């Protein structure tokens, strides 16, 4: 026996799909076949007959017919093929027969030779004729499960039915009136199996679209805590370690520069000759003076020696209100005045001989006067990198004392074993180098003597 053209076409499609085709796809094909070819002929005044149950499984069918009378039957759509299944309650068990549709659109029970034009005609036939080889006949149709006295309804425009009217009454049990106290309401249309299938498919598609449209909510990013360096220290205990390191580095660099300015003077000056101790101790009066420099050499006045600042002997200068430029100018004038006074009083002082420290300005003057070989004052060379050279050979060094710091600027010394702690936190800025400094800044005393002699001459 051969099925109808539509049934054969769908059967070939299922065979081409193979066993890998999902059950949902098979049911979709069967539903499409039923809606396009079978629904118009099955509907009775727009309503499905009570014996048609749509898509239910074999197990559900047996559970439904278990408590029914002998011969109770129903027709359902196959869940594994395109076609109908006839199920009825036999004497010992439930029996299932496949109903095929022929090319001439007639229905035939598998194993029989007699075909029928409609399913309703087929059922009436087997209510009178026994099904072979069991010898059993059909009795009454097994009704579908009704929900709250609602009946199924279907029409040809099923796909255009308003879905908003299909609201199950079981969702609102409190709103239903009591059957005993109130008159029975007119019956409402029940959602058929076709409506349910269409609703299920539409709800799946709508839920997929909604789930695709709704963005995934991302949890908010936790607020970042403020950094320690962004907060200003509120008290003396809130010390930031990076700032502390910067201060230590700045103090270390300042100490290195100060030690570099004092290193050359300490290497070449303040050196005593063997067998002689440095003469001159600070008296009580000199110690009480803030600007005292210690014992002045013989032939010098106290006010002349007091013009030298502390830095001439390598001591740190305490902070004052004067500007750094004026301090540097005063230091150079005092240094030149001390050097010229020492040269003028060389004959009067014979006990203590002082050596002049070599500077660029005095070195030029010493070259102009080469006849100072027999003078008790001699030039002491500056120590550069641990080597000392005498500008006038043949002169034995006696007692030397530093008259002032050399005008060499800053010199960085690497490899110092121990850095001294400077007593003054202010950085000393030396005066700018000038080759003609010694000649431009003449002492006021010689200038007065020079003009006085000219007056007397004229």
Swiss-Prot record:
SMART domains named among the record's database cross-references: SH2
Region annotated Disordered, chain positions: 204-235, 267-326
InterPro entries reported in the protein's UniProt record: SH2, SH2_dom_sf, SH2D7_SH2
Domain SH2: 51-142
Highest taxon of the lineage: Eukaryota
Keyword match Zinc: no
Compositionally biased region (Polar residues): 304-326
Biased composition regions of type Basic and acidic residues, renumbered to the chain: 278-288
Keywords: SH2 domain
Protein known as: SH2 domain-containing protein 7
Organism encoding this protein: Mus musculus (Mouse)
């Amino acid at each position: 026996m051969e099925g109808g053209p539509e049934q054969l076409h769908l059967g070939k499609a299922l065979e081409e799909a193979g066993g890998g085709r999902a059950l949902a796809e098979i049911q979709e094909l069967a539903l499409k076949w039923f809606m396009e070819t079978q629904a118009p002929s099955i509907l009775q005044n727009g309503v499905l007959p009570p014996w048609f149950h749509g898509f239910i499984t074999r197990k559900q069918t047996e559970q439904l017919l278990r408590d029914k009378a002998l011969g109770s039957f129903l027709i359902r759509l196959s869940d594994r093929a395109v076609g109908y299944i006839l199920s009825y309650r036999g004497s010992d068990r439930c029996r299932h027969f496949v109903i095929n549709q022929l090319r001439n659109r007639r229905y035939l029970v598998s194993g029989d030779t007699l075909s029928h034009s409609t399913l309703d005609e087929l059922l009436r036939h087997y209510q009178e004729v026994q099904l072979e080889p069991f010898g059993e006949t059909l009795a009454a149709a097994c009704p579908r499960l009704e929900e709250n006295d609602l009946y199924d309804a279907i029409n040809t425009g099923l796909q255009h039915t308003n879905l908003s009217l299909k609201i199950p009454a079981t969702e609102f049990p409190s709103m239903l009136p009591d059957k005993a106290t109130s008159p029975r309401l007119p019956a409402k249309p029940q959602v058929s199996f076709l409506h349910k299938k269409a609703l299920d498919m539409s709800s799946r598609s709508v839920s997929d679209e909604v789930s695709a449209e709704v963005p995934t909510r991302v949890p908010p990013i936790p607020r970042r805590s403020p950094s320690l360096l962004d907060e200003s220290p509120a008290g003396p205990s809130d010390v930031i370690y990076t700032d502390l390191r910067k201060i230590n580095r700045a103090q270390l660099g300042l100490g290195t520069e100060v030690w570099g300015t004092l290193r050359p003077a300490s290497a070449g000056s303040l050196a005593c000759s063997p067998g002689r101790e440095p003469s001159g101790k600070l008296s009580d009066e000199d110690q009480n003076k803030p600007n005292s420099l210690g014992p002045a050499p013989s032939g010098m006045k106290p006010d002349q020696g007091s013009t030298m600042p502390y830095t001439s002997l390598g001591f740190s200068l305490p902070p004052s209100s004067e500007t750094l430029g004026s301090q540097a100018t005063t230091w150079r004038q005092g240094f030149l005045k001390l050097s010229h006074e020492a040269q003028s009083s060389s004959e009067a002082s014979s006990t203590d001989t002082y050596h002049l420290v070599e500077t660029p300005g005095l070195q030029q003057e010493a070259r102009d006067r080469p006849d100072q070989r027999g003078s008790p004052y001699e030039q002491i060379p500056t120590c550069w990198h641990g080597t000392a050279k005498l500008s006038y050979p043949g002169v034995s060094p006696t007692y030397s004392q530093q008259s002032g710091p050399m005008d060499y600027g800053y010199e960085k010394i690497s490899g110092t074993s121990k850095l001294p702690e400077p007593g003054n936190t202010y950085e000393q800025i030396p005066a700018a180098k000038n080759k003609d400094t010694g000649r431009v800044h003449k002492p006021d005393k010689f200038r007065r003597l020079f003009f006085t002699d000219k007056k007397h001459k004229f």
